[in-house]
Amino acid sequence: MRLITTLLLLTTLPALAAPPLTTVAEESGFTRTGRYAEVEVLCEAFAARYPTAVRCFDFGTTPQGRPMKALVASTSGALDPLAARRKGLPVVLVQGGIHAGEIDGKDAGFLALRELLEGEAAPGALDRQVLLFVPVFNVDGHERFSAWNRPNQRGPVEMGWRTTAQNLNLNRDYLKAEAPEMQAMLALVNAWDPLAVVDLHATNGAQFEHDIAIMVEPLFAGDPALRTIGQQWRDAVIADLAEQGSLPLPFYPSFVVYDDPASGFTDSVAPPRFSTGYFWMRNRLGMLVETHSWRTYPERVRSTRNTVVSVIEQIAEHGQDWQRAAREADVAASQPDPTPAPLTFAASDKVRTIDFRGYAYTREPSDVSGALMTRYDETTPQLWQVPMRDDVQPAITVPRPGAGYLVPAEHAARVAAKLRLHDLVFHELPAMAQTQVQSFRATSKKFGASPVEGRQTLAVEGEWADETVALGKGALYVPIRQPRSRLVMALLEPRAPDSLLAWGWFNNHFEAKEYMEAYVAEDVAREMLAKDPALREAFEKRLAEDADFAASPAARLDFFYRRHASYDQALDRYPVLRVGSDPR
C-alpha cells in the first residue's frame, strides 16, 4: 500500500512532496528487499528528483508482461545514446538481478546511484561518464518471491528465483540469446555500446572469510591492450575494496574438487554464454562481481555498493583512455590475422601455493547422504595454503577463415536473426555457381545425454577441407573482418563451446535419415569383398584388432554401408561453410 501511495504522489502531486529515494532494504535495516513495484516507483522518482541528470525508461517487456526498467544517469546531460556519443562519454552498464535470488545489486545500485547524485560518493564522476543501471534483469524471476529460493544464502528474508518465467537461465544465454529478456538486453547494449559492463551476483560455495570476488575480462583473452586495462581495472577495484575493509578475491572461489578445500582453485576464461565471457569478444570490458552468500545481506549490499562506486571512480579517471583503446581494438579485430583463433581456454599444469582465509573444518562421512561432507567452524578462522592454477592459456585453437562464413539459404533466416541480435555485419548473396569453400565434416560427435536450457547439445570433432559447391539465392556471407570478429567465430565455428552447432541448432544434419536393411547389406558386403581385395584386407584387420567391432553385427554391416554409393554423403556435414575470399 505504501508503494501505491508513493506512486500516486509521484504521478499526481509532484509539487507537493518529493518521493523518497530510499529502498525497503534500507528501511528494514537490510533484512528485506522490495518487490518489483518498488523498482518502478524508484525509477520514476529518481528521474523526477533529478530531471536533468536521470532518465527512467523501459527497454523491454518480459514474457509475463512486466516492463524491464533502466535508469540512465549523467550530470553531463547526456541521457540518450546519441548524446553520449556526441560528447564522447564512456558508458558503464551496471546490471543487477540476472539471478533474481542474488539481488544484492538492485539495492546496492540504488544506494550507490543516490549517493553519486547527491555528491556523497565520487563527486563529479558522473560529469565524465554515463551510468546505465538495470536494477533487475530477470524481472519475472524476481516476482517469484519466497523465503526458500536461496536456502544457502543469509538474507534477505525473501527473494526472487534464479530463472525466468520460461525457466531459462539468463546467465547462460548471452550468445545463444533465446530468452526475450536477453534479446531486449542485447538491443540495449547495441544502442548504448557500453565500454564496461558490471554483472552483480552472490555466489554459493564453501564457508570462508573472503566476502567478495572480482573477475574481469579481457584479462586472459582478447585484445592485448584491453587485457592490460582489464588487469588495471580489476586490481584498482580490489584495492579500493580492501581499503574499505573487504577481503576481495581476484578469482571465482570454487574448489577444483567439490566440497574439498585442499583441492584449491583453478582460473580460466568463461565461455560467452556468461557476461564476462561475452563482452571481451565485443572488445569491451566485463566485470563479474560475486559477493559470498554466507555473508549477511547488509554486508553483501555494502560491498556491492563499494564496488559500483569504485567502478564509477575508475571510469571517471581512465574512461577516455580506455574508450580509445576499445575503439583501437575494434579496428584491430577488423584486420587480417594469420594467428590461430582460440575457442576455449584452460589453466596449464603450473601450480603455485596461495594463502586463503578460511575456517577450521573437518571432513567426515555423512550418515544421511553417505558422502564425505565438510563442516566449517566459523568461530575459528584459519589460513589455508592451497594450490592455485592460474596460468591460463588457449586450449582449442583453429585457423581463422580467410574471408568469412557462408550460411546456405535454407538456414539463412534464423541465423540472420541471431546475427542481428549481436549487431554483426552480413550480406545476402545471389545464386552462386561452383564456388571454392571449406566444409566441415564431423569425425566424431556426442549428443548431450540430458537437455541443457531446453536444448540437446552437440559436441563434434573434425576438420575443414576444401570443397566446391553451388549455393542458391539467399545465402548469407558473414565476413570475418569486422569489429566483432570474435563473436562471428564464437557463433559459427563448429567446435566453439557456445556455437549455434553446440547448442543443437543443426542436430538434424548429424542424424542418419536413410539406411540399408541388414538383409540387403549382407549381400552388398559380399559383393564388395569379392571385388575389392584391399577392402577385404581392411575388414579382416578391423575384425582382428577391434573386439567390439567384431562382436557387433550392426557395426560390421555399417563398415560396408559407409563405403557404398548409397551412403548419405551429407551426413555429419556442418551446413555452414568457410570461404577464403569475398564472394560478392
Question: Residues of each region from the PLM?
Answer:
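Sec-dependent signal peptide recognition
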Residues: 1-9
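Structured catalytic-domain cores with a bias toward divalent-metal coordination
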Residues: 18-584
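N-terminal signal peptide c-region/cleavage motif recognized by signal peptidases
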Residues: 12-14
